[in-house]
Amino acid sequence: DLRMSRGLGDVYKRQIPIHIYADQVNCDKRYIIPLRIAEVSDYEPTPTDTVLMVNLKMVNEYSGTYIISGTNVRYENDEPIVSETSSLNTPRTMIAVDQYTVRLFHKVESEELTNADKAAMKLIVNPTDNTVTIEPWKDLPILKGGGTFDVEKHTFTIWYHYMENGKEYRTEATIVKNKS
């Protein structure tokens, strides 16, 4: 039931479930649905203000704000070079791409849309067994990777190999959803 009532001058905010075909939506674009007030009880609608603009925000079970912590290690001939290890601990926003996919920015890259092509990846969760497949968003040179998603803790555990300046690196990280 989507009926509502409010007093004169009261601000009303309500979430209305709208289901869309996410595979046909670009997560980086803004979509607005105009809704017109057709009728009201007790009052006359103001003729100039009868349209509501609804801004869509794509979310899924995995999207939201997280803290990523882990390590980056340089690899050579499939062996880690322990002396070339750096730590990673930064907040990240996972953007819903579709029902089972989120976009994650690599390392501590700025989460600006202009960086997405070269510095973002997709985490694709298999809902059957909660394994995670890692793929580049566009141009990030990921060689291989994988992981798991813990449904109860809302935590990703991932690893992936990537190339940077002609050298191979491995990231191992735990990504924990921010509860606040």
Language model feature labels by segment:
Residues 2-4, 8, 12:
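Single conserved hydrophobic/aromatic residue that forms the stacking wall/gate
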Residues 1-3, 17-32, 36-180:
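Intrinsically disordered, low-complexity regulatory regions in eukaryotic proteins
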